[in-house]
Each structure stands twice: as C-alpha cells, then as structure tokens.
A protein has these predicted regions:
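Short, flexible loop/hinge motifs at secondary-structure junctions
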Residues: 1-181, 223-224, 253-254, 393-396, ...
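Catalytic center-proximal scaffold of phosphoryl-transfer enzymes
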Residues: 2-3, 8, 101, 158-542
C-alpha cells in the first residue's frame, strides 16, 4: 500500500510526480478490482456447490440463466430450421404387457384361500338358481417379511474304543470348518452385516440397534471383530488374486478420497486416504475394483501398487501420478477431461446471469462447448470395438482437440482473463496437462475421463458420511478389502449379500493346516467365475 499524501504535499508535487502517483494508484485500483472479482467468483462458486445442482453438464449450467432472458440467451441464427419429422412427437412406447409377471416369476408363491361368495348371497342377489360360476379372477401382490433368525444346532457323533488297538480313543464325525473357531457367526449372518454396512452404507451402531429391536444382542464391537478377523484371514488372499487380475490389464484407472482414522495418525485430525484402483471402463469381461488404505497420498503409494505394472493409468491431475511416468518405464499416465473442464464450469456457474449473452461469449463457456463436442462424439463411439473407436477418434476428435489447444494457448497469450480467476486457472491447467490429456487419442481402450473411478469410490464416500471415521488402521484396511469385493461383485452383476454368503461358506475349505489360503487356487470363487451359483447373480429384467 502506497503512502497517503496530504493536500499540501500534492500541491507541492511537480507534474511528473503527480503522474507517477496517479499511475501507481491506477495499478493499485486494478489489483483491488481483480481481487474483488476473484473473491466474488469464489463466493458464487461456494454457493453453487452448497446450494446448487452438483453437476457440470452444459445444459444444467445454461438452466441457471434468467428465465426472462431465455430468448436472448438461446438465440442462435446459425441453427437450421428443424424438419417436420423432428418436430412431430413420436408414437408413445406403451409399457410391455406381462412385465409384472416377468418381474415376479422368480419369487416363491403362496396361494391364499379364495374370496368366496356364499350360495345364500347369490340366491338373494340373482334369485334362486339364476346364476352360474365363471372363471375365477386372480391377481398378485408382493409381500415382504422381516429378516428371521434361526439358531443352528449342530450335532457331532462321538465314539470311543472299548477294546482292540484303539481302546479309549475317541472318534468324531467330520464337522464343517467354522468361519471363526468358537464363534456363533455364520456366513449368512456376517454376509448380512457386510451388506448393510458396505453395500447400503449404514453404520454398525444402526445395525446393532436393529438387531436389538429383534431381540438379538450383538454389539458393534463384536461385529467389528468379526469383520476384521475374516478380512485378514479370508479376504486378504482373495483380494490379492483380484489384484493380480487388475494388474494384468492394459488400462487401469485410479482415484483417492480422504478419510479419518483416529488410531493411525501422528497428528490429530490429519488426513488418511482410501485409494481405489479399477479396470479400464471399456473392459467389461472381468471388471475389477481394488480399494487400498494408506496414511497419505504421496507418490510412494501408487508407486508401490503399480511397481510391476505395464500399461496406461487414467487419473486426475494429481502430480503424484505423473511421477509414475518417470519412475516406472512401463506406465503411461492419461489425464481426465472431466477435471480439465471443471474450472471452466465453475467460472460459468459464478458468472453474472443477468447478462446471459456475455456469459455465452465468455472464454469459459466457449471452452465448455468445445470440450462438450469431444464428449458428444466419444459417447457415440462407446459401443464400438476398440480398434474402430480409435479410428473414429483419430478422424473426428483429434482435429478438434488440436484446435482446442491452439485456441487455449491463444487465449492465454492474449491475457483476456485474469490469471488467478477460475477461467485463467483452467487455461493454465489445460496447457500444462496437454500431453496427458491427449493420451486417450492413442488407444481405443482408454476412456476420455476418470469418471468410472469416481463412481467406484462413491459408495465409500456415502458410507463415510454415515460412520464418519475408522477407529483403527486395522478397521480401515478391513474396510478396503470388503469394499473391493462388494464393488467388484456389483460390476459383475452379482448380488453382494448372496455372493458374500457363498464365498464365506467356501473360503474355509481352502485353508491349509496352518489356516493359510493360496490365492492361486481361488479362481472359481472370483466374481466373474462361471462356477458361481445362480442365486449370486443379479436377475436380468427382460
């Protein structure tokens, strides 16, 4: 801040000194105005995230413009007049007949006693004998019954020798291996707990309360112990086998989200992270999701996970991933276009909607339109084989991408927007990430963005809003293992509860004499295995 001058000092200044003072004040005023505009933009963005729609689609951003300025904002004289076929409504698709029967066909049925009409009532209404019985009407309703509890009583026959070589020796019937020795927990009970906590994102204290309402007293501490012990004994080797499958794929995707673990931090309230690694979005045959708990998100974490990997890793712009390109010769990092457009979307959301034409003419809005065209074309190509998708990308999208980067560099060079504004930050981000953002043009199996990873980690993000934190690192690692199985099961169109129940029934059979499991022997239990029982599979609606 410059010194304040008194009236007497200004009167005594020379012409050159006055010019210097005015120019200096103009510079200060420009800086202040720029800071004020940036602060206003930040407030609008914060309000948008807090109160507005949590979406970055161009249509939703357009929808925030003033209703009374709709004609001006939507006017585009270059748009051709639509044909009659585009204007006239298409014939309405009526609901398919028999759909209810199809939806209900796999459920057990119970025929209830018929609702009868007595002979006396018939004679009174029609007159004696003036009636005959027609075909009965039937209809179906779906009934739900709360979960039931059954105590399993297992009986083991015991014999003792009374003579011969084995006198006084005991012989017992061969009993199945317990899930946890000496515990009342069964595969069905633990599967139910896992389904409620990790699939439906409910906290264990709510499960405990629901159990108590049904007269079952199982504390959340007991449930936590069951989860951790089974995760360490059974799920760890199981997920190791899934990880082997993931790292054999040519394209993977990764993301991370903060979480709080009370007992695993040197500093109170410091952030730990849950990482998610998944198969490429276009890999539909055996999709895999691996969760991994880590204390931080420095580059050593993904470096260790992908140390022996050879392929393309799709991520956001986190610098830690970019280091993998340099330290791991087999890894190529591809960036996410959804992150590239985020700053521009924020800028448009924060713009003054009283002047929609200026918003549409803004650099941020034009950038969004250009990126939206990439997405529009790429969406059309999703069902194509990878080779055809690559050909189409090279022909139709690559020229648009090259034009986009040339346009971005021109805007940055002309300094049309303040560098510290969201638009300025967006331009700077795109320029610095150019090489990473172009990688999807080199392989048809590389997705245009990392949205699949964000979807894979969403269940965890919903869950942590309910249970807030983990108490221990053991609990966090156990959660990572369970989420890996449940999310992979969902991607493979399995029903998580039935799948958990099945593998918890089978996994004890794979333990050797020391209680260890060889991951190489678990192929027939994997979520994509053809040997899985039909009840594990999600019914397909016709």
């Amino acid at each position: 801040m410059a010194d304040r001058h008194t009236l007497e000092e200004l009167n005594n200044c020379s012409r050159e000194e006055l010019i210097t003072i005015v120019l200096m004040m103009q510079g200060q005023l420009d800086t202040l105005n720029e800071n004020i505009e940036r602060l206003i933009e930040q407030v609008r963005i914060a309000n948008s995230y807090r109160f507005g729609k949590h979406t970055e689609t161009l249509d939703s951003i357009d929808g925030q413009m003033s209703f009374f300025d709709e004609a001006e904002s939507c006017c585009d004289l270059s748009v051709p007049e639509p044909a009659a076929e585009e204007v006239l409504p298409s014939r309405r698709n009526h609901k398919k007949k028999g759909q209810r029967e199809t939806d209900l066909k796999d459920f057990p049925e119970e025929i209830l006693p018929p609702y009868q009409v007595s002979t006396e009532e018939l004679d009174t209404f029609y007159g004696a004998g003036n009636w005959r019985r027609m075909k009965d009407e039937t209809y179906k309703r779906l009934r739900h019954e709360p979960e039931s509890w059954t105590v399993e009583i297992h009986t083991v026959e015991v014999y003792v020798g009374t003579g011969g070589d084995h006198q006084d020796e005991f012989l017992r019937g061969k009993r199945p291996k317990d899930l946890l020795r000496g515990s009342i927990v069964t595969p069905s009970l633990l599967a139910s707990i896992l389904n409620v906590k990790y699939v439906n994102s409910s906290a264990l204290h709510r499960v405990e309360q629901e159990f108590q309402r049904n007269g079952v007293n199982i504390s959340r501490q007991t449930m936590s112990n069951w989860i951790i012990r089974c995760a360490e004994k059974y799920f760890a080797p199981f997920v190791d086998r899934m990880k082997q499958e993931l790292l054999s794929l040519p394209v993977t995707q990764s993301d991370e989200t903060p979480t709080q673990v009370i007992g695993d931090s040197d500093r109170p309230n410091s952030k730990c992270y849950m990482w998610v690694h998944r198969s490429g979005e276009f890999y539909k045959e055996r999709p895999v999701v691996i969760y991994e708990y880590q204390k931080g998100r420095d580059h050593e974490k993904p470096l260790e996970f992908y140390r022996n990997y050879k392929g393309v890793l799709v991520t956001d712009s986190l610098a830690q991933y970019h280091l993998l390109d340099k330290k791991l010769p087999g890894v190529t990092n591809a960036n996410c276009w959804a992150h590239a457009r985020r700053a521009f979307a924020d800028a448009v959301k924060a713009a003054d909607k009283k002047d929609p034409l200026s918003v549409k003419n803004s650099v941020a809005y034009q950038a969004l339109q250009k990126i939206a065209e990439f997405y529009r074309i790429d969406t059309e190509l999703k069902e194509l084989p990878a080779t055809d998708r690559l050909t189409q990308r090279q022909t139709r999208i690559k020229p648009l991408v090259e034009d986009f980067f040339a346009w971005v560099k021109q805007q940055a060079a002309e300094c049309t927007v303040p560098p510290k504004s969201r638009t300025g930050q967006g331009l700077n981000f795109v320029i610095h990430q150019e090489n990473y953002l172009k990688v999807f043009l080199t392989d048809g199996d590389i997705p245009i963005d990392n949205s699949a990873s964000e979807r894979a980690i969403r269940t965890f993000c919903i869950g942590k809003k309910n249970w807030m934190f983990h108490n221990t690192a053991k609990g966090a690692r156990a959660s990572a293992l369970v989420y890996s199985i449940s999310e992979t099961a969902k991607l493979n169109n399995l029903r998580p509860y039935y799948y958990f129940r099945y593998i918890l029934t089978e996994l004890p059979k794979y333990c050797d004499e020391k209680g260890n499991i060889n991951p190489a022997k678990l192929d027939q239990l994997m979520p994509w295995a053809e040997e899985l029982p039909e009840e594990c599979r999600k019914p397909r609606r016709s």
